[in-house]
């Protein structure tokens, strides 16, 4: 699969990797406070009306393994879905699924947990 065939998948992959590198430079992707400061989902923040976190959390990953597993999954499934739906519809499905996954994550986390990752966006 080439960039020409599935450009959005590649863009999301690059974006996730660049965001992870930035998080590591600013603190640590394993540090809950760093993740919270950069847009991860927390019970308190969502309850205070910070709904933008449902979107921002899609691009944050907790540790290198989380990033690697989601990147491999995105490459395989995202490429397949983007070729099937087309780039524009793929963006809509990816973002909508990610926001839905973030909302589901929020509904199940404890008040002291931090939620992040693209799993909801990838797996719908």
PLM regions: where:
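N-terminal, membrane-interfacial amphipathic/helix-forming hydrophobic leader that caps
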Residues: 1-2
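Hydrophobic core segments of transmembrane alpha-helices in multi-pass, intramembrane catalytic enzymes
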Residues: 70, 123-124
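N-terminal TM1-TM2 helical hairpin plus the immediately adjacent luminal interfacial "cap"
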Residues: 5-118
């Amino acid at each position: 699969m080439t960039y020409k065939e599935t450009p959005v998948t590649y863009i999301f992959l690059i974006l996730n990797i660049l965001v992870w590198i930035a998080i590591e430079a600013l603190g640590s992707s394993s540090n809950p406070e760093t993740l919270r400061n950069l847009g991860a989902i927390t019970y308190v923040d969502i309850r205070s009306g910070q709904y933008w976190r449902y979107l921002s959390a899609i691009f944050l990953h907790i540790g290198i393994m989380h990033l690697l597993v989601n990147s491999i999954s995105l490459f395989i499934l995202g490429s397949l879905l983007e070729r099937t739906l087309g780039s524009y519809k793929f963006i809509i499905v990816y973002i909508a699924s990610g926001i839905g996954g973030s909302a589901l994550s929020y509904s199940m986390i404890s008040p002291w947990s931090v939620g992040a990752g693209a799993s909801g966006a990838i797996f719908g």
